[in-house]
C-alpha cells in the first residue's frame, strides 16, 4: 500500500515538473489583446470581406516597394509646404508651441536661400518653377542609384485646378513655404501632448458628426490623456452606439480619421525615446495603452490601409498622364518604373474596398453629401496648421494631404476599367500636384510601416510573455528566498543590487558575444589559410603565379619560346 502511494506521489510530481519545464506553445493566448488579429478569418468591417491576414500578406509584398520609393527616390524624399507661416484658422485659447528639441524640423536656412526663392522672384513664375529648387540641387546629393545630381524638376510643383480637392494644399509659390527632407525628419515620439493636442483631436473627430445633430459624445473624455489615451468605457460604448446609427459615409469618414490616428500613434510608440538611456526604440506599453487595448482602433488602421490600397489601384491606367521629372529622362523613368511596379502589384491583388457603395443614392442628395464630406475633410486638413509641434504638424499635413488625395482619386476619378468599352483611357486624364503624389505614396508608406510595427510589437509581447526558462525560474526562486530571510529594511538595497547585477550580466554577455564572434572569424580565417595558400601559390588560377609569369615574359625574347603547332 505504501509503495502504491509512493508511486502515485511520484507520478503527480512528474506531471507537475513536466507542466513547468515542458510548457510550450504560443505565448499569444486567446485572451490576449492580439486574439482578434490572431484569427485569420476576422473580417474588417466596411471592406470587401478582407481579413487581417489578407492585408498583412499583401503588405509583405508592398512594403519593400514602398521603402524603395520613399528612401531611394529624390522625388519622394522632399516635400514643400508652409510649415511655419500659416495661421491657425480656429480660435484655440490654449495655443502653445512644443518646447522639446524632438519637435523641431530640419529645413534649409533662410539666409542661405538664393534670391530666386524670394517672394518677388516667386511672384513672377508661372506653371513649372525652373529655379525654385536650385538650392537643394546644389547642396544635396541624390539618393538614387546611378544618379549623382538631383534633377530640379523632381522637386517642382505643377499648378492644378482647386476644384474637387479634399484638403487644403499649400501653394508652393508662397514665399513662406520651405523644403523638408522626410528622411531627416522621421515620424517618431516628440513628447507633444496635453490639453492643446487633445483639443485639436476633439475638433477633428467632431467633423464626423452631422451639423444637424448635437455632439452627444464627449470627445475630450475619449482623449483625455493625449493621443489615443484609454477612454472611459461608457464613452466608448456611446461612440459605438452612435456609429451604428451613422450612414456608411459617416462611418468611412470616422474610420479614416481613426486609422490615421492609430497609424500616427503606432509610429510614435515604435520610435519612442527611452529617457533612461537616450535610445530610440519600440515601447510596448505605449502601444498597448494607445492602440492595442482597443480593437476598433487596430481595425481602423487596417481599414485605412484597405482604402488607401484601392486608391493606389485606381492609378492603374492613369500613370501616362502624370509627369515626375520632366527634364531628366533617367530620373523620370526610374520614378515612373517604381510607381508602376507598385501600382501593378496592387492592381493584380484582390480588391479590398468598394468606393461605389458611397454616395450611391439619389444624384442630388449624393452630390450634396459628397460636398459635405469634402468640406469636413478640408476642415480636418486645416486643423493641422494649429498643431503646436513642428514635426507633428509636418507629418499631420502630409498624411491629411495623402488621405485627401486618396479620397479625391476614389470619388472624383473615373475607373478606367469600367469605361474602357465606351471611351479611350486618355479621356480620363488624372491631374495631381506633385505634393499630392508625394503625400499619397508617403502616407501609404506610413500605413504599411504601421502594419509592420504591429507585428514587431506582437513579437515583443510574445517574447515578454513566453514561459520563463529553467535557469530564470531558479534565479527567481533564489531571489525570493533571499528576500524572505533578510530584513525589510535591506530590501531596497537588494533590489538595487539585483538591478545592477542584471545590467552587468547583459553587458558582459553582449561583450562576450562580440569577443566570441571575433574569435570565430579569426579562427575560421586560419582554417581557410591552407586552401588560400595553395590557391595563391600552386593553382593554375594563382594570381601570384600569373603575375610572375606575365612579368617574366616581358624580359624573355619571344623567339626563345618554342612554337606550338596548330591542330
Swiss-Prot record:
Entry membrane topology: Peripheral membrane protein
Primary subcellular site in the record, as a coarse category: endoplasmic reticulum
Top EC category: oxidoreductase
Mod. after translation: N-glycosylated.
Active site: 389 (nucleophile), 392
Cofactor (UniProt): FAD
Signal peptide interval: 1-22
InterPro entries found in the cross-reference section: Ero1, ERO1-like_sf
UniProt key word Flavoprotein: yes
Record-level Gene Ontology MF annotations: FAD binding; protein-disulfide reductase activity; thiol oxidase activity
GO CC annotations, alphabetized: endoplasmic reticulum; endoplasmic reticulum membrane
EC number in record: 1.8.4.-
Disulphide bond pairs: 88-386, 98-103, 154-325, 389-392
Record keywords, A-Z: Disulfide bond, Electron transport, Endoplasmic reticulum, FAD, Flavoprotein, Glycoprotein, Membrane, Oxidoreductase, Redox-active center, Signal, Transport
Subcellular location: Endoplasmic reticulum membrane
GO BP terms in the entry: protein folding in endoplasmic reticulum
Family annotation (SUPFAM superfamilies): ERO1-like
Protein residues bound to FAD: 188, 190, 201, 258, 261, 290
UniProt entry tagged with the keyword Cytoplasm: no
Glycosylated residues, chain numbering: 49, 546
Subunit structure: May function both as a monomer and a homodimer.
Family: Belongs to the EROs family.
Physiological role: Essential oxidoreductase that oxidizes proteins in the endoplasmic reticulum to produce disulfide bonds. Acts by oxidizing directly pdi1 isomerase through a direct disulfide exchange. Does not act as a direct oxidant of folding substrate, but relies on pdi1 to transfer oxidizing equivalent. Does not oxidize all pdi related proteins, suggesting that it can discriminate between pdi1 and related proteins. Its reoxidation probably involves electron transfer to molecular oxygen via FAD. Acts independently of glutathione.
Name listed for the protein in its UniProt record: ERO1-like protein 2
Lineage: Eukaryota, Fungi, Dikarya, Ascomycota, Taphrinomycotina
Amino acid at each position: 500500500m505504501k509503495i502504491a502511494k509512493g508511486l502515485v506521489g511520484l507520478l503527480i510530481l512528474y506531471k507537475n515538473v513536466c507542466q513547468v519545464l515542458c510548457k510550450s506553445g504560443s505565448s499569444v493566448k486567446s485572451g490576449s489583446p492580439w486574439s482578434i488579429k490572431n484569427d485569420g478569418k476576422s473580417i474588417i468591417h466596411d471592406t470587401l470581406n478582407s481579413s487581417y491576414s489578407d492585408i498583412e500578406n499583401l503588405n509583405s509584398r508592398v512594403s519593400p516597394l514602398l521603402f524603395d520609393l520613399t528612401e531611394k527616390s529624390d522625388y519622394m524624399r522632399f516635400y514643400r509646404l508652409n510649415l511655419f507661416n500659416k495661421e491657425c484658422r480656429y480660435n484655440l485659447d490654449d495655443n502653445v508651441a512644443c518646447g522639446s528639441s524632438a519637435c523641431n524640423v530640419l529645413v534649409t536656412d533662410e539666409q542661405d536661400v538664393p534670391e530666386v526663392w524670394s517672394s518677388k522672384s516667386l511672384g513672377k513664375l508661372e506653371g513649372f518653377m525652373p529655379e525654385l529648387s536650385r538650392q537643394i540641387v546644389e547642396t544635396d546629393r541624390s539618393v538614387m542609384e546611378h544618379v549623382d545630381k538631383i534633377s530640379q524638376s523632381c522637386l517642382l510643383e505643377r499648378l492644378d485646378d482647386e476644384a474637387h480637392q479634399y484638403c487644403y494644399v499649400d501653394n508652393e509659390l508662397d514665399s513662406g513655404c520651405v523644403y523638408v527632407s522626410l528622411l531627416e525628419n522621421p515620424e517618431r515620439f516628440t513628447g507633444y501632448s496635453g490639453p492643446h493636442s487633445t483639443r485639436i483631436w476633439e475638433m477633428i473627430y467632431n467633423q464626423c458628426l452631422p451639423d444637424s445633430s448635437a455632439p452627444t459624445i464627449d470627445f475630450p473624455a475619449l482623449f483625455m490623456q493625449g493621443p489615443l489615451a484609454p477612454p472611459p468605457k461608457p464613452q466608448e460604448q456611446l461612440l459605438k452606439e452612435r456609429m451604428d446609427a451613422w450612414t456608411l459615409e459617416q462611418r468611412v469618414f470616422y474610420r479614416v480619421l481613426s486609422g490615421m490616428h492609430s497609424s500616427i500613434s503606432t509610429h510614435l510608440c515604435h520610435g519612442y525615446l527611452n529617457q533612461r538611456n537616450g535610445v530610440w526604440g519600440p515601447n510596448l506599453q505605449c502601444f498597448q495603452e494607445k492602440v492595442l487595448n482597443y480593437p476598433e482602433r487596430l481595425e481602423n488602421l487596417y481599414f485605412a490601409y484597405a482604402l488607401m490600397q484601392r486608391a493606389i489601384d485606381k492609378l492603374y491606367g492613369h500613370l501616362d498622364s502624370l509627369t515626375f521629372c520632366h527634364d531628366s529622362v533617367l530620373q523620370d523613368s526610374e520614378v515612373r518604373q517604381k510607381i508602376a511596379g507598385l501600382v501593378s502589384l496592387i492592381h493584380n491583388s484582390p480588391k479590398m474596398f468598394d468606393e461605389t457603395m458611397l454616395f450611391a443614392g439619389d444624384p442630388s442628395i449624393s452630390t450634396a453629401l459628397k460636398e459635405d464630406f469634402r468640406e469636413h475633410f478640408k476642415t480636418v486638413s486645416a486643423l493641422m496648421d494649429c498643431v503646436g509641434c513642428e514635426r507633428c504638424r509636418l507629418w499631420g499635413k502630409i498624411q491629411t494631404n495623402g488621405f485627401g488625395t486618396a479620397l479625391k482619386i476614389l470619388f472624383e476619378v473615373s475607373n478606367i476599367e469600367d469605361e474602357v468599352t465606351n471611351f479611350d483611357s486618355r479621356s480620363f486624364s488624372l491631374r495631381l500636384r506633385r505634393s499630392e503624389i508625394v503625400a499619397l505614396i508617403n502616407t501609404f508608406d506610413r500605413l504599411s510601416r504601421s502594419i509592420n510595427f504591429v507585428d514587431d510589437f506582437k513579437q515583443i509581447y510574445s517574447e515578454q510573455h513566453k514561459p520563463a526558462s529553467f535557469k530564470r525560474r531558479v534565479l527567481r526562486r533564489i531571489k525570493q528566498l533571499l528576500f524572505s530571510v533578510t530584513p525589510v529594511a535591506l530590501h531596497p538595497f537588494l533590489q538595487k543590487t539585483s538591478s545592477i547585477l542584471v545590467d552587468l550580466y547583459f553587458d558582459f554577455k553582449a561583450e562576450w558575444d562580440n569577443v566570441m564572434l571575433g574569435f570565430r572569424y579569426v579562427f575560421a580565417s586560419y582554417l581557410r589559410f591552407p586552401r588560400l595558400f595553395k590557391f595563391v601559390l600552386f593553382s593554375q588560377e594563382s594570381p601570384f603565379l600569373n603575375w610572375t609569369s606575365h612579368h617574366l615574359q616581358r624580359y624573355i625574347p619571344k623567339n626563345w619560346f618554342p612554337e606550338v603547332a596548330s591542330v
